[in-house]
């Protein structure tokens, strides 16, 4: 058996070359015609309320046939006041002219329901910790925090539907309350609202690119996890770790890369982000089996009920556990039966998979702290975050 930490980190060595792609230009190097700025979006009519162009009077039908759509749009703009005034909030103000607050409440309700329930706040703490080094201003930090928080909570709405989950943070999942269709629409809607927050940043062209890239990675990771589950195809440990790098690591990288777009500090944190992403997700997999608090909030060994290949399960199957076939059958059942779940835990125990997972987690904790010591500037926020994760691991029975 290979050393736990080495086997956990090795699959990411090639991935790290593309995890933090470098932007070719900073915003100051873009020429004006290269960018479609929010001001230009307003000018070309993309954000104009329905019917707003008709208010400027009718055009001669014979002349209009020779006028391009862009010319028509610009004609309207030239005869109307500048509504943007360099303030992104104006976009929302224009949209609100024909969109009622009551309607907004209705379509956001599934999202607001889950967002209003306190979570781990790991992403907010990560942003605070990394910004200790990047020193991004408070207003930009708030925009980044809002973007990542909205994207994360919206992804949970979709996650719970795809996993047929019943509980989230100790309460019924949003789709159990509002229905599947409305919850899907609310989640997708909030993805775009999250992206719109980035227009508040001076570096918004880079920030939008980062957001899109990491949302693509998130969906790649989620897609592979669903494929393995629905086809009962056990992934290799390498494939599983790559999935984590995309799904969980995607939002972690989004935080750091968005901070980088707004910072003058040049600090290489790639390896630390990789380790934290692995640490967080594998710890979550372990707690799903071993932590009483998570059992109360989501249900004991909910990963088995969802038919999900978690880190301990992947290890047991990969090691050729004596009852490998029985474990696969239990995953296929997607059962809530406590006796079956307890039998599955016994299989993992006998295969040494829970001990292995715990050993990997302690190794990741040591690795993260070793990397932290290499930075010139001490980071008490990152130390506190690691301490909290270690305490959570130690609390598992």
UniProtKB/Swiss-Prot annotation:
Annotated binding of dimethylallyl diphosphate, by residue: 168, 247-248, 281, 288, 298, 308
Enzyme class: transferase
Binding site for Mg(2+) 1: 159, 163
Binding site for Mg(2+) 2: 159, 163
Pfam families recorded: polyprenyl_synt
Cofactor binding summary note: Binds 3 Mg(2+) ions per subunit.
Ranges for region Disordered: 1-67
EC number, UniProt record: 2.5.1.-, 2.5.1.1, 2.5.1.29, 2.5.1.10
Biased composition (Low complexity): 52-67
Cofactor(s) needed by this chain: Mg(2+)
Site features described as Important for determining product chain length, chain residue numbers: 191
Protein name: Geranylgeranyl pyrophosphate synthase AN1592
Family designation: Belongs to the FPP/GGPP synthase family.
Function summary: Geranylgeranyl pyrophosphate synthase; part of the gene cluster that mediates the biosynthesis of the diterpene ent-pimara-8(14),15-diene (PD). Within the cluster, the HMG-CoA reductase AN1593 functions in the mevalonate pathway, which produces isoprenoid precursors. The geranylgeranyl pyrophosphate (GGPP) synthase AN1592 is needed in the formation of GGPP, the precursor for diterpenes. Lastly, the pimaradiene synthase pbcA performs the 2 cyclization steps that convert GGPP to ent-pimara-8(14),15-diene.
Keywords carried by this UniProt record: Isoprene biosynthesis, Magnesium, Metal-binding, Transferase
Originating organism: Emericella nidulans (strain FGSC A4 / ATCC 38163 / CBS 112.46 / NRRL 194 / M139) (Aspergillus nidulans)
Family annotation (SUPFAM superfamilies): Terpenoid synthases (SSF48576)
Induction text: Expression is positively regulated by the cluster-specific transcription factor pbcR.
Chain sites annotated for binding Mg(2+) 3: 284
